[in-house]
Amino acid sequence: SPAKPTMHPGSRTTSYIMKGVTNAHSNFEKAQRVNHWYTIAGIDVYTMKNNLSAIAIIGNSITDGRGTTDNAQNRWPDIMSEMLHLKHKITNQGVLNLGIGSNQVVVPGGIGTLAKDRYDRDILGQCGVKKVIIFEGVNDIGNTKSGNSETTARLLIESYQNMIKKAKARKLKVYLATITPFKGAGYYTYFHEACRQYVNDWIRSQ
């Protein structure tokens, strides 16, 4: 367990809290139900097989599961994992979801440690990772003042470059996703859209 108590408020999965010792045969009818996770920082699966690997995803609420159904496990990484297993018969790769709702890459604010600072721990520090998906940046743009959009674009690109460099140094394959459209959001302006397009143009050029 982690040194400090932790929680995942956006787990979209029910936890059952009871006093005393419980097991799979316990009656949970009187348990307190909350749609959060607590305490556990991570789970490793030990195996004697040597052909297993993982795909680690760093992202924000889009990856964390904002808008999905509680207990349905229908976040896009869940669906991706299911498609790999069922449709493509790839059963030796796991998908690790390291998304944090309201997380940001470089612009201070939001929830959790900035992606550029948690990348080593949350992505490179995971066991068995062979592929990395970077899908984050929209919150940085949305929380940038219009006059600072060029600076945010530059800092995002620099952070992406650094993440990619670190992954390639470990011989990991990297997929960098473009930033999704956000027209209609309260922070949408011409300047924010121009910033998104600039960053996406750079991503597509790589």
Predicted ranges, named:
Residues 54-59, 63, 93-99, 130-136, ...:
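Structural recognition of the beta-strand scaffold that forms the well-ordered cores
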Residues 1-58, 63-71, 88:
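N-terminal secretory targeting modules
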Residues 15, 64, 104-106, 142:
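Basic, gly/Ser/Thr/Pro-rich low-complexity segments located predominantly at protein N termini
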Residues 51, 91, 170:
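Residue-level signal for beta-strand positions within conserved beta-sheet cores that form or flank
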Residues 89-107:
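Short connector loops at secondary-structure junctions
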Residues 71, 78, 82, 86-88, ...:
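Alpha-helical cap/lid subdomain in secreted, periplasmic
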Residues 61, 83, 98-101, 166:
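Generic, well-ordered alpha-helical scaffold segments in large soluble proteins
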